[in-house]
UniProtKB/Swiss-Prot annotation:
Its EC number is 2.4.99.28. Residues 1-8, 71-72, 160-161, 205-225, 288-304, 357-367 are cytoplasmic. HAMAP family: PGT_FtsW_proteobact. It catalyses: [GlcNAc-(1->4)-Mur2Ac(oyl-L-Ala-gamma-D-Glu-L-Lys-D-Ala-D-Ala)](n)-di-trans,octa-cis-undecaprenyl diphosphate + beta-D-GlcNAc-(1->4)-Mur2Ac(oyl-L-Ala-gamma-D-Glu-L-Lys-D-Ala-D-Ala)-di-trans,octa-cis-undecaprenyl diphosphate = [GlcNAc-(1->4)-Mur2Ac(oyl-L-Ala-gamma-D-Glu-L-Lys-D-Ala-D-Ala)](n+1)-di-trans,octa-cis-undecaprenyl diphosphate + di-trans,octa-cis-undecaprenyl diphosphate + H(+). This is Probable peptidoglycan glycosyltransferase FtsW. Keywords: Cell cycle, Cell division, Cell inner membrane, Cell membrane, Cell shape, Cell wall biogenesis/degradation, Glycosyltransferase, Membrane, Peptidoglycan synthesis, Transferase, Transmembrane, Transmembrane helix. The keyword Cell division applies. The gene is ftsW.
Length: 367
């Protein structure tokens, strides 16, 4: 196999541009709220800038680490991440917000282990699929063990009230298994078996039912369950084609909840308009398309599965976030990669891009 020197510069550029633009949008979306809550309009800007710096350093390190090293660390990282997920439940260590226990409290920083768990899952599956790909046509020795492991992780995430992360991990794993050659009937059969459980989880939790009803008809409860999506629509509608101008949005002025986190695209749409949203969506599409090309041209199965999993993760999270913001899906609590405020998501996303970039230096041909 011929080795191609040099990183995929388009992947690198998209990650850097999206992150830098995200820092700007975090400031625009949060400055007024930060000034009122923390008496410092630059509070979230300074923190997000620090997260971006750490993320860029992590990406730079990952770019220069031979991705084959992750084979040795795939299982320890996977098990270690599971331990971190359990630490969330330990009093004094785990942090709770809005009824969800998802964070580990660190000095000056709350770490969300589910973000690391997504990448750890991809690394473990890439390692395992390379070794066991010939067994995937069999149910008990091939497909079922992955579902068993996934079931344990998903149970822990659901106990943390983090259905968004649980569904994301499940979707990424299923796509990776399908790409590796798992029979479609196994996947469809698992879906039919899991359907009653999913319905039970939704219909037995009042807050999840409110999300579903708000998704179907937000105007039925415009001041509570439907409030967030209605304010998001108002922001996007007000932005029109060209937007109100950077920093000129009104919905971020205590109307739109989570304006600098999960719904930052709404602020972007109001200030940069339809054009701005299309540009951001196009950048994500280009990032995912180039990442998949890196996966296809990878020199071995481990690199192929690793790059493909990262591409699917970033693309899926971006798609789901945009779908939620525009009302095409119920709210899930999934951040927009590179743009939403949050250290765990940004740092892990940039580091995963660094791993993917290292894969791009060892390909069978130019991507």
């Amino acid at each position: 196999m011929r080795r191609v020197e040099g990183y995929d510069m388009i992947v690198l550029m998209m990650a850097v541009i999206l992150t830098c633009f995200g820092v700007v949008m975090v400031y625009s979306a949060s400055s007024v709220m930060a000034a009122k809550k923390f008496h410092d309009g630059f509070f979230f800007l300074k923190r997000q800038s620090l997260y971006a710096l750490i993320g860029f350093i992590g990406m730079g390190v990952a770019m220069h680490v031979d991705y084959h090293v992750w084979k040795k660390w795939a299982v320890p990282l996977f098990l270690g991440t599971f331990f971190l997920l359990l630490l969330v439940f330990v009093p004094g260590i785990g942090g709770t917000a809005k009824g969800a226990s998802r964070w580990i409290r660190l000095p000056g920083f709350n770490f969300q282990p589910s973000e690391l768990a997504k990448v750890a899952l991809i690394m473990y599956m890439a390692y395992s699929l390379e070794k066991r790909q010939d067994k995937l046509k069999q149910f008990m020795s091939g497909f079922f063990p992955y579902m068993l492991i996934l079931g344990v992780f998903i149970a822990v995430l659901l106990a943390q009230h983090d259905m968004g992360a649980a569904l994301t991990m499940l979707a990424v794993a299923i796509v990776m298994l399908f790409a590796a050659g798992t029979k479609v009937q196994y996947i469809l059969g698992m879906g039919l078996v899991a359907l009653p459980g999913i319905c039970y989880l939704v219909f037995t939790k009042a807050y999840r039912m409110r999300r579903i009803t708000a998704f179907l008809d937000p105007w039925q409860d415009p001041t509570d369950a439907g409030f967030q999506i209605i304010q998001s629509w108002l922001a996007l509608g007000t932005g029109g084609f060209f937007g109100q101008g950077l920093g000129e949005g009104k919905q971020k002025l205590f109307y739109l909840p989570e304006a600098h986190t999960d719904f930052i695209l709404s602020v972007l749409g109001e200030e940069m308009g339809f054009i701005g949203v299309v540009v951001i969506a196009s950048m994500f599409l280009l990032l995912v398309q180039r990442s998949i090309r890196v996966a296809i041209a990878a020199e071995d199965s481990f690199g192929r599965f690793l790059a493909f999993g990262i591409a699917i993760l970033l693309g899926l999270e971006a798609f789901v976030n945009m779908a939620v913001v525009t009302g095409l899906l119920p709210t899930k609590g999934i951040a927009l990669p590179f743009l939403s405020y949050g250290g765990s998501s940004l740092i892990i996303s940039l580091c995963s891009v660094g791993v993917l970039l290292n894969v791009s230096t060892r390909m069978r041909g130019a991507a």
